[in-house]
Amino acid sequence: MIARRMLRFTRDRQRVEELVHDCFVEAYLSLRSYRGDSPLEHWLSKIATRVGYRHWKTQRRDRQRMVQLQSVPPRSSAPATASDASELAGYLLDQLSPRDRLAITLLHLEGRSVPEAAELAGWSQTMMKVQAHRARKKLRALLEKQGIHHE
């Protein structure tokens, strides 16, 4: 369960293992805060979401320090294959801020409800809705920049 969640935050298998380890270390250190009023799986899922979110923030900060991201050449049409689409989706998600990326991942990639996504992120439902709206708007702009227009 935790490893599957971490795959949403990185595709690097070795990094997934490190993030899973970080989740369990954080869970162990936070064990006193577990109240038992919700399933342990839910509590661990919340910790995993926060660990993944911090990973994105750190990754983005490190990238900005080292080099500017290279831009993908504009496309004249939609991606031809599933592999192209997956590559483009990964590139577009990398362009979003960690907050935007978290909202998109929880709501659209994992298919969670707004209340559930908000709880996992530690945000209010209103904040989740606003963040998701802004993230979708940014994704549309990035798609148009790549020459792919939303219908």
Regions found by a protein language model. Give the residues of each.
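C-terminal flanking helix
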Residues: A3, F24, S97, R101, ...
